[in-house]
Amino acid sequence: MDPNCSCSTGSSCSCAGSCTCKACRCPSCKKSCCSCCPVGCAKCAQGCICKGASDKCSCCA
């Protein structure tokens, strides 16, 4: 398990398709955590790749 992972499900990070790693600090999945990121989002600034419009963001709200 990634020591930087704050995920509560399973023993490893699993963020494909959704942001289950709320802190986005897991090197193994942080790039797929956020579907979108508003300007100034500290979580996504740590490495999340934004894949949608910021007005639909749920992981950095």
Swiss-Prot record:
Keyword list, A-Z: Metal-binding, Metal-thiolate cluster
GO BP: any one term: cellular response to copper ion
Positions of a divalent metal cation 3 binding: C15, C19, C24, C29
Metal-binding among keywords: yes
Alpha: annotated span: 30-61
Pfam families, per database record: Metallothio
Domain commentary: Class I metallothioneins contain 2 metal-binding domains: four divalent ions are chelated within cluster A of the alpha domain and are coordinated via cysteinyl thiolate bridges to 11 cysteine ligands. Cluster B, the corresponding region within the beta domain, can ligate three divalent ions to 9 cysteines.
Binding site for a divalent metal cation 7: C50, C57, C59, C60
Function: Metallothioneins have a high content of cysteine residues that bind various heavy metals; these proteins are transcriptionally regulated by both heavy metals and glucocorticoids.
Cellular component annotations (GO), alphabetically ordered: cytoplasm; nucleus
Gene Ontology molecular function: zinc ion binding
Name listed for the protein in its UniProt record: Metallothionein-1C
Binding-site list for a divalent metal cation 1: C5, C7, C21, C24
